[in-house]
Amino acid sequence: MKISKKATTIAIVNQKGGTGKTTTCENLGIGLAMEGKKVLLVDTDPQGSLTISMGWQQPDELPTTLSTLMAKAMDDQSIPPGEGILHHAEGVDLIPANIELAGLEVSLVNCMNREKMLKQVLEGAKHEYDFILLNCTPSLGMLTVNALAAADTTLIPVQAQYLSAKGLEQLLQTVQKVRRQINPKLKIEGILLTMTDSRTNYGKQISNLIRQAYGKHLKVFDQTIPRSVRAAETSAAGKSIFQHDPKGKVAEAYQSLAKEVLADADRQRKLSSERAR
């Protein structure tokens, strides 16, 4: 009997740095865990930004990371359940990354089925978790393509400023290409406006511009993530915003985003089961 797939895999992607990908991956993941869901976070960035942000300050010293698991997949070796998974105090699991992943990305180029190595690594985990969140590298290289090939949906954090919105076109083209060539079921979960400042006219103007430009074709999340000094401090502390500033507006925003993502996932599940009848 075939086990029906369980986890919803979300790639958090934007080739531009500084848009709040890592912060969103960590806090959305922990927000979903607070709603009672089993969550796996996967760091696909050779800089190990998510790994460090979650408190593993020396990722290069970790014995097993994503590159270890992907190398096994490339060699057609089996991956024991739970291998390389770290447990975080706030109730989520993590597959960490370090600089070895940069070398692995280069060797992927000559690999058969190279776009699907991450998908292969996550195959077993799909049945163990409700959500798998992939923190993508700030580029559109082979690691990001692997993340898009492994994902059910993609969530795009966009910093609320003019230049950030420009790179969005290029990213959307990449998503379309992956959909056409590798992963026809890939959906866009939505655009998440980060570092918003609703107190200034400029901030409101940008948010409105992005909603007008993309809102007709794509979901732009109602919930935005406000700019906050306290949120910027969390990545240095190895704690999520829920630990660092639980009563603050950013914690509230990520909790609300988690609820929005859950509602979307439930809606998708209902649609899929209706189609299957």
Regions found by a protein language model. Name each.
Residues 1-277:
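P-loop NTP-binding core
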